[in-house]
Design a protein with these regions (language model features):
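N-terminal Rossmann NAD(P)H-binding glycine-rich loop of SDR-like oxidoreductase domains
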Residues: 1-26
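SDR active-site strand-loop-helix element
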Residues: 6, 42, 67-71, 108-113, ...
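Short mixed-charge
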Residues: 24-36
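Rossmann-fold cofactor-recognition segment
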Residues: 38-53
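NAD(P)H-binding glycine-rich loop region in Rossmannoid oxidoreductase-like domains
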Residues: 49-89
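NAD(P)-cofactor binding segment of oxidoreductase domains
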Residues: 81-109
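Catalytic helix-loop patch of NAD(P)-dependent Rossmann-fold dehydrogenases
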Residues: 88, 92-96, 116-158, 162-163
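NAD(P)-dependent short-chain dehydrogenase/reductase
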Residues: 146-193
Length: 193
């Protein structure tokens, strides 16, 4: 099996590479199918997913069985400030990958977000809950999901929430850094994840 990971320098792409290389994840062991896989990891400098011709070129060259799309515009405030960029990366990029995956017979794993939901309520979300994004980030990620459903016949959509890891600026990283610098911290306590 050959796996292509996009967004390889980001938080999730980096962690996926580590998990596959070490065969161990925080939640348990990695499948034997994955252990023997050849992994090709690319970032925007090698594969701009918003460029359909480049997607065709790279995916046809690599001949992967599975594409895991970790490439995304994830800065929520940045997506509000630059909606066109967010749409290109979070919607058109997955569309391009899905179209080419369908042409070459590869599966696509589209990483999405809980921001596709409204973000209100007092109970944890379920994947069957109604989607109704309120932010540009959530809307563009939902467009990406819908494009994958429309253009690929072999796909998985994984909605994440509260990603954290050894790389990147995330909630855990921020709290640990602030904990070293401050005597006390105040954080919201009304969010479910």
């Amino acid at each position: 099996m050959k796996i292509l990971i996009t967004g390889s320098h980001g938080q999730l792409g980096t962690e996926l590479q580590r998990i596959i290389a070490t065969w161990v994840a925080e939640i348990g062991k990695v499948s034997d199918n994955i252990k023997n896989a050849e992994v090709v990891a690319v970032d925007v400098d090698k594969l701009d997913i918003t460029n359909l011709e480049q997607v065709k070129e790279v995916l046809n060259k690599e001949k992967q069985d599975v594409v895991i799309n970790c490439a995304a515009a994830t800065n929520v405030d940045g997506c509000e400030a630059n909606k066109d960029f967010a749409f290109k990366v979070n919607a058109l990029g997955p569309r391009n990958l899905a179209m080419v995956c369908e042409e070459i017979g590869a599966k696509i794993v589209q990483v999405s977000t809980d921001y596709v939901f409204r973000g209100v309520g007092d109970a944890p979300l379920n994947e069957t809950d109604i989607v109704a994004p309120v932010s540009s980030y959530g809307k563009t990620k939902l467009w990406g999901e819908n494009f994958v459903r429309e253009f690929a016949s072999k796909y998985y959509i994984v909605r994440t929430a509260w990603l954290y890891g050894y790389k990147g600026h995330n909630f855990v990283y921020t709290m640990m850094k602030l904990g070293k610098d401050k005597e006390s911290l105040s954080v919201v306590n009304d969010q479910l994840g």
